[in-house]
Amino acid sequence: RSTYGGTIPWVGIHAIDWILWMSGGRFTSVRASQSAAEAANGVAPETTALALFEMEGGALASLTVDYLNPAKFPTHGDDRIRVIGTRGEIEVRDYGITLINADGVQHPENAPDADLFTDFLRQIETGVPCRLSGEESFAATRAAVLAQAAADTGETVRF
C-alpha cells in the first residue's frame, strides 16, 4: 500500500460518492473483499472488489468494482446505480433512467448535465454553495479508505 492505495479508493470512490449523494445517508460500517487473481503473474492491483455498507436507519448499499477489463469489453467503463426502496426502484445505466413504482415502468428524460466545475467557479465568485460540498467529498474519501481497509484486513470496519 505504500505505492498503491487500492482499487476501491481509486475506482470505487465514484460510486461511493453517488451512494452518499443520492441517498443523503451516512455509512455506519463496511465489509469488503477483493481479488487480484486475474492479474498478470499476480503482480498488479486488485482487479475486482466488493463492499457492503451498512447505513444509518438500517439500509444497505453494495458496491462492485472491476478493473483491467479489455477495452472492447461490452461493460468497459460502464457505471450504474440502482436504488430500491419500499415504494419502488430507480436505476441509472447506459445513459438512461428506469423508474419502477406503483404506476408501472417509466423512462423519465435525463436531467441536463451539471457542470460541476462551473458550479465550483460560481461558488468562488458569488458565494453560492456548490451542489457538492467539501464535507461530502471528505466523507466519500473516508468511506473509500475504510472500505479498502476492510478488504485488506477481512474485518468489518465501523465509521
List each language-model region with its residue ranges.
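C-terminal helix-rich "cap/oligomerization" subdomain common to oxidoreductases
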Residues: 56, 122-159
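Active-site rim elements
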Residues: 4-7, 105, 126-131
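Short glycine/threonine-rich loop-to-helix capping motif typified by GTGT followed
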Residues: 44-49, 149
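A structural signal for well-ordered alpha-helical segments within the folded catalytic domains
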Residues: 13-17, 114-118, 135-142
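Residue-level signal for the nucleotide or nucleotide-sugar donor/cofactor binding architecture
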Residues: 10, 78, 132
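NAD(P)-dinucleotide binding in Rossmann-like oxidoreductases
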Residues: 40-46, 55-117
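Predominantly a Rossmann-like dinucleotide-binding segment in NAD(P)-dependent oxidoreductases
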Residues: 1-43, 154
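Short beta-strand scaffold segments in enzyme catalytic cores
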Residues: 51-53
